[in-house]
Regions:
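Extracellular carbohydrate-recognition regions
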Residues: 27-118, 245-270, 553-613
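Aromatic- and acidic-residue-enriched carbohydrate-binding clefts of CAZyme catalytic domains
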Residues: 45, 76-139, 274-312, 339-354, ...
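Catalytic-core region of carbohydrate-active enzymes that cleave or remodel glycosidic bonds
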Residues: 317, 406-423, 436-437, 441-547, ...
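Extracellular glycan-recognition regions
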Residues: 561-733
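Extra-cytoplasmic beta-strand recognition segments
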Residues: 64-71, 138-140, 151-183, 209-216, ...
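Catalytic cores of secreted or luminal carbohydrate-active enzymes
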Residues: 492, 498, 506, 521-561, ...
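Carbohydrate-binding surface patches
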Residues: 736-774, 780, 824
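Extracellular carbohydrate recognition and processing domains
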Residues: 190-221, 673, 687-705, 787
Length: 831
C-alpha cells in the first residue's frame, strides 16, 4: 500500500469539526468472546485471460501476434466478416444446439503492417515451419529493392519504450537463398522517429535463423513500434527489466501491483477459458510449456487469441516469487455451460482426468516422474507451491457431479494433501459424495452486498469450507465507483466474521487493458505505461493487510435497518432455464373482493409464452423468462394460482411490487438454485440483486400441479404451497454502516473495521470490554471519497487511496466520527 501519513493535528481538526454530532449508536466489543479465526489463506487473486489481462497486460511481451498464429480458429469454427461462429454442439443439460457468435478480426495479418505496399507484399504461410506446434510464418516478398521496406508491429495499442532501458529482441528469420539485402531492427516513436537501430546478422540463407539482440531507445515513447527492414516465423520484444528479472517474464509494474495485494494464493487459468466456448478452444496447459516460440496459443473465450505466454510454468513461478500458493483449475470434459455447454463422451473422461493428474505431477511430482522431470528440464527441480485444485469451473448438473466424484476420488488417492474444490454454491452440493470446499460466485449490484453481509451466518458447518472464488459489485456502478467498493468492504466483513466457514476469497476479474474491456468492472486498469488500482483494489489491500488472527464478538454487525413498505407495483411470473405452466390465476384485494385480470395484457415478455383457455405456458429455457401482468398495481392483495414444472433445472419466479418499468421490486425464487432452495430476491435494474432475507430448502417435482398462494401486505409477504407456509419476507431499508472486529495476536491490537456508505459523517461510540488496558495512541487507515460515484482514473490514479494517521484518542470507551463514503480501520493496542 502507498501510505500517506497525516499529522495528528490535521486529524484532530477533522474530528473537532464534527464535535457537535453525538453518537447515536454504541458498538460494544468484548475481547473475551472469541469468534472464528480468520485463515491466512483468506485473501488471494484470480487470474484469467480476459480484457487482455495477460497478453497486453501482466505478461511482458511487447509484440502482438509474435508467432503469427492469430488467425487460427478452433476446430469446427468458421468466420463471416468480423464474426466467429462456434462449432454446433449439443448442450449436455438442455439437449439444445445453441447459436453463438463472437468477435473476429478482419486484419489480414493481425498486429503487422508494411510501411509500403508498393515495394513489398506479405502473406501468411505454413511452408517449412520452424515449429510444427506453431506452424504459421509470415512471408515478405520485396518487389522493389530500391525502396526500404519496414515490417511494423505496434504491439498492444503501442509499445512502451523508455529512454536508455534495454529491450531484448528475439526473431526467427529465414531469408531466401538468393537474398542479398540486410535486415535491421528498429525501435520507432509513435511518429516514426528512429529511437534505436541494430543490425540483425543473418548467418544461414535459406534456413531458419534464431537470433537475439539488445536495443536501447534514445527517447521515451508510450506508443512506440518495432520494425524490421527487409520469411519471419517469430518476433518477440521484452523489456530487460521484468518482475524478478525472469526471461519470458512479467511486466514489472503490473506484477508489483498484484504483489501489493499480498495474495495468499493465485487461481489460474480461469474462469471460462478453462472450459472454452466449446471444448475445442479450452485452455490446454501442456501447450503453454516450453519455448515461447513453439507455443500455439488459442482463440480465447473472450474474443481474442491468447499466446500462452503466461503459461503454467510462469504462473507457478509467479506464485513462488510472491510467496503465494497455487490453485490449478482443471477441465472435466465440459464446455462452458453459459455458452455452448457441450460434454465430452464418457469414454473421454479418463483423458481429462489424466491431463489434470499430469498438471499436478508437473507442479509437485518428484523429478523421477514423467512430468516432474519435465519441470526439472525447465530449470526447477524443486516442487512448486501447488496446494489447491478446483475441479471444473462454473459447471453444474448431474453430469458435472458424476465427473467431479471421479476426479475427487482419483486425486485424493494420490495426493491427499491437496485441497479440492467443487463448483457448487450455497444452494447445495447436488449429487456429489464429498468435497473439501465449494465455490459460490457473485457479480451483483451494491444493494446485494449491503443486504447480504449475514449470508454465511447461518449456513451449515462441518461438510465443507467455502471459497468465494469470484465476486464483485459490477451492476449499476458504471466501470466501478466508490459505492461498489464500499459494498464489497461490507460483504468482506461478513466473510471475515464467518472465518470458520469462509477460508478463501478472490475478486474478479483482476486486470483490464483500457483498450479492451470485455467485462464491465475490473479491479486494476492498465495501458502501455501505466497501471492503477480502482477504489476496490484498496479495499482488498486494506482487508488483507489488516487481517485479524481471530474475530471478537460485538453487539452489532450493521446499523439498524428500518422496516419499509413494498412498492405498489405489478406482479408477474417467470422461470430460469425451466419450462413451466400456470393456470386458475385469481387475484383478490385486501377486502377479499376479486380483482379482474386480463392475462393477455403483459407489459414485459421474455421467453416463449402462450395463453390458451386460461393456461399460461412458458416453453423455453431462457434465463430468465418473464411475464409481467398489466392492469394491476398494489401492495395489499392475495394472488392464488396453480403451477406445474414441465422440465428444466429449477422451479419458477413470482414477481411482485415491480415498478412501472418492471426494473425494481421483488421476486420469490421458488425451488431455485438447482431445484433446492426458495428465497426472496430483490430486483434492481431488471436483474435479481440477490437474496433478501431468509432462504429455505425446497424443491418441486416435475409434472405435478401445486396450489400456490402469495399474500402481500405493505410490510410483509407470505408464500404458501399446497396450504403450507414456505417462506415469509419483510422489506427493510438497506443498512448504511457495517462493523467487524478482531484481534491481531502478533501485534496485540484490536482491529475495528467500519464501512460508512452514507453521505453524512457517522459518529459512533466504541466500547472495549474484557480488556485490562488500552493504549491511547493507535493507528487509523481510512479510504474515503467526496462522492460514492467517484473513482480513480488514469489522470487521477490515487484520487481514492488509503490515508494512514496516528490517533491519540483511543480508550476503553471512545467516540470516533467516520467520514462520509468511507472504509476505515482502527488499530488499537489492548490487552
Amino acid at each position: 500500500m502507498k501510505k500517506i501519513f497525516l499529522p495528528f493535528a490535521a486529524v484532530a481538526l477533522l474530528l473537532s469539526s464534527c464535535k457537535d454530532a453525538a453518537p447515536k449508536e454504541e458498538l460494544v466489543i468484548n475481547l473475551q468472546e472469541k469468534g472464528a479465526e480468520v485463515a491466512s489463506s483468506m485473501y488471494g487473486i484470480f487470474f484469467e485471460e480476459i480484457n487482455h489481462a495477460g497478453d497486453g497486460g501482466l505478461y511482458a511481451e511487447l509484440v502482438k501476434n509474435r508467432s503469427f498464429e492469430e488467425l487460427e480458429m478452433p476446430e469446427g469454427y468458421y468466420a463471416e466478416g468480423d464474426v466467429l461462429h462456434p462449432k454446433k454442439v449439443c448442450n449436455h443439460i438442455s439437449g439444445e444446439v445453441r447459436e453463438g457468435s463472437f468477435r473476429w478480426t478482419t486484419e489480414p495479418v493481425p498486429g503487422w503492417t508494411l510501411s509500403t505496399k508498393d515495394a513489398a507484399e506479405m502473406k501468411l504461410t505454413k511452408e517449412q515451419p520452424k515449429f510444427s506446434t506453431a506452424p504459421n510464418n509470415l512471408k515478405v516478398t520485396i518487389k522493389n529493392a530500391s525502396t526500404p521496406v519496414r515490417l511494423i508491429n505496434e504491439g498492444y495499442w503501442g509499445v512502451n519504450l523508455v529512454k536508455d532501458n534495454s529491450y531484448q529482441l528475439r526473431t526467427i528469420i529465414r531469408p531466401a537463398s538468393d537474398y542479398k539485402g540486410k535486415v535491421t531492427a528498429l525501435l520507432l516513436s509513435e511518429q516514426g522517429e528512429v529511437l534505436a537501430s541494430a543490425p540483425v546478422d543473418i548467418t544461414a540463407a535459406g534456413q531458419w535463423n534464431d537470433l537475439s539482440l539488445a536495443m536501447q531507445p534514445t527517447a521515451t515513447s508510450a506508443k512506440g513500434k518495432l520494425a524490421l527492414e527487409f520469411d519471419v516465423d517469430y518476433v518477440s520484444l521484452f523489456p530487460e527489466k521484468t518482475f524478478h528479472d525472469r526471461p519470458n517474464g512479467l511486466r514489472k509494474d503490473v506484477a508489483e501491483i498484484l504483489e501489493g495485494l499480498h495474495p495468499a494464493f493465485v487461481r489460474w487459468p480461469g474462469g471460462c477459458v478453462v472450459e472454452g466456448i466449446s471444448l475445442e478452444n479450452r485452455f490446454e496447459w501442456k501447450k503453454s510449456l516450453g519455448d515461447p516460440a513453439a507455443r500455439s496459443g488459442e482463440y480465447s473465450t473472450w474474443g481474442y487469441r491468447c499466446s500462452y505466454g503466461f503459461g503454467y510454468h510462469e504462473m507457478l513461478q509467479f506464485c513462488e516469487d510472491i510467496d503465494a500458493k497455487a490453485m490449478f483449475v482443471c477441465n472435466v470434459g465440459l464446455g462452458c455451460q453459459y455458452r455452448m455447454g457441450d460434454a465430452s463422451p464418457e469414454s473421454k473422461i479418463a483423458y481429462y482426468l489424466d491431463d489434470c493428474m499430469d498438471a499436478i505431477e508437473y507442479a509437485i511430482g518428484d523429478v523421477t516422474t514423467e512430468w516432474g522431470a519435465k519441470r526439472a528440464e525447465q530449470g526447477h527441480p524443486e516442487p512448486f507451491p501447488l496446494q489447491y485444485v478446483e475441479i471444473g469451473n462454473e459447471n453444474w448438473g448431474d453430469e458435472y457431479d458424476k465427473r467431479f466424484d471421479i476426479f475427487y476420488t482419483a486425486i485424493k488417492a494420490k495426493y491427499p494433501e491437496l485441497i479440492l474444490i467443487s463448483n457448487h454454491g450455497l444452494g447445495g452440493t447436488g449429487k456429489i459424495a464429498k468435497t473439501d470446499m465449494i465455490d459460490p460466485h457473485w457479480y451483483v449490484n451494491p444493494e446485494f452486498f449491503f443486504q447480504n453481509t449475514t449470508i454465511f451466518d447461518n449456513h451449515p458447518r462441518g461438510k465443507y469450507d467455502v471459497y468465494v472464488g469470484e465476486y464483485a459489485c459490477n451492476a449499476n456502478v458504471g466501470g466501478g465507483n466508490m459505492r461498489a467498493a464500499l459494498s464489497e468492504a461490507a460483504f468482506i466483513s461478513g466473510m471475515e466474521r464467518n472465518g470458520d466457514l469462509v477460508k478463501m476469497t478472490s475478486y474478479a476479474p483482476l486486470l483490464e487493458n483500457r483498450n479492451d474491456r470485455s467485462w464491465a468492472v475490473n479491479l486494476i486498469w492498465l495501458d502501455t505505461d501505466q497501471v492503477l488500482g480502482r477504489s476496490s483494489y484498496y479495499v482488498q489491500q486494506m482487508a488483507a493487510e489488516n487481517r485479524p488472527t481471530y474475530n471478537v464478538k460485538s453487539n452489532m454487525t450493521m446499523s439498524t435497518p428500518r422496516i419499509a413498505d413494498y412498492n405498489e407495483g405489478r406482479f408477474g411470473f417467470g422461470s430460469w432455464h425451466t419450462q413451466v405452466e400456470f393456470k386458475d390465476v385469481k387475484l383478490t384485494g385486501a377486502d377479499g373482493a376479486p380483482i379482474d385480470l386480463d392475462l393477455n395484457k403483459a407489459v414485459k415478455k421474455e421467453g416463449e409464452w402462450s395463453l390458451d383457455n386460461g393456461l399460461l405456458k412458458q416453453t423455453s429455457l431462457r434465463e430468465p423468462a418473464k411475464y409481467i401482468v398489466d392492469g394491476f398495481n398494489g401492495n395489499q392483495f392475495t394472488l392464488e394460482f396453480k403451477v406445474r414444472k414441465e422440465g428444466g433445472n429449477e422451479g419458477f419466479f413470482l414477481y411482485f411490487g415491480l415498478s412501472e418499468d418492471s426494473n425494481k421490486g421483488f421476486v420469490y425464487n421458488v425451488a431455485g438454485w438447482n431445484n433446492g432452495t426458495t428465497a426472496v430476491e430483490g430486483v434492481i435494474g431488471g436483474r435479481t440483486s440477490g437474496v433478501a432475507g431468509d432462504r429455505v430448502s425446497h424443491s418441486l417435482e416435475t409434472d405435478k400441479w401445486y396450489d400456490a398462494k402469495l399474500v402481500v401486505t405493505p410490510q410483509k409477504s407470505e408464500l404458501f404451497m399446497d396450504g403450507k407456509l414456505i417462506l415469509a419476507h419483510a422489506p427493510e431499508t438497506t443498512p448504511l454502516q457495517f462493523f467487524s472486529s478482531g484481534y491481531d495476536e502478533a501485534t496485540g491490537e484490536v482491529i475495528v473495521k467500519v464501512v460508512n456508505s452514507e453521505a453524512q459523517s457517522y459518529p459512533l461510540r466504541i466500547k472495549l470490554d474484557g480488556v485490562d488496558s488500552v493504549e491511547k495512541t493507535g493507528k487509523v487507515i481510512s479510504l474515503s471519497a467526496a462522492s460514492d460515484m467517484d473513482e480513480n482514473s488514469f489522470e487521477e490514479p490515487m484520487k481514492i487511496s488509503p490515508k494512514e494517521s496516528e490517533y491519540k484518542g483511543f480508550g476503553k470507551s471512545f467516540d470516533y466520527t467516520f467520514p462520509p463514503f468511507s472504509y476505515t480501520i482502527l488499530r488499537v493496542k489492548a490487552k
